[in-house]
Amino acid sequence: RDCRSQSKTFVGLCVSDTNCASVCLTEHFPGGKCDGYRRCFCTKDC
């Protein structure tokens, strides 16, 4: 199961899952995706 946490360092509107995932890597998460409100959420197994 995936747990989600909003990115602390992502700035601006999230339009690219790739950019979001890159920022999440710097926050020690394995990945991330944009949600419907254009925010970046980092994901990890929980």
Curated annotation (Swiss-Prot):
Plant defense peptide. Signal peptide: none annotated. GO terms for biological process: defense response to fungus; killing of cells of another organism. InterPro entries: Defensin_plant, Scorpion_toxin-like, Scorpion_toxin-like_sf. The keyword Disulfide bond applies. The keyword Magnesium does not apply. It comes from the Eukaryota. It holds the Pfam family Gamma-thionin. This is Defensin Tk-AMP-D6. SMART domains: Knot1. Keywords: Antimicrobial, Disulfide bond, Fungicide, Plant defense. Disulfide bonds join C3-C46, C14-C34, C20-C40, C24-C42. Belongs to the DEFL family.
